[in-house]
Amino acid sequence: ASGENQAELKLATHNVYML
């Protein structure tokens, strides 16, 4: 979110893939 764009993006992508 703040200062962790890459980490957050990776998490979001993983969440989407899991769905």
UniProtKB/Swiss-Prot annotation:
pH profile: Optimum pH is 6.0-7.5.
One Gene Ontology biological process: killing of cells of another organism
Catalytic activity: a sphingomyelin + H2O = phosphocholine + an N-acylsphing-4-enine + H(+)
Broadest EC class assigned to this enzyme: hydrolase
Listed cofactors: Mg(2+)
Protein EC: 3.1.4.12
One MF term in the entry's GO annotations: toxin activity
Keywords: Cytolysis, Hemolysis, Hydrolase, Magnesium, Toxin, Virulence
Function, as annotated: Required, with sphingomyelinase, to effect target cell lysis (hemolysis).
Oligomer status and interactors: Monomer.
Further comment: It has a high specificity for sphingomyelin, hydrolyzes lysophosphatidylcholine at a much lower rate, but has no activity towards phosphatidylcholine, phosphatidylethanolamine, or phosphatidylserine.
Family: Belongs to the neutral sphingomyelinase family.
Record protein name field: Sphingomyelinase C
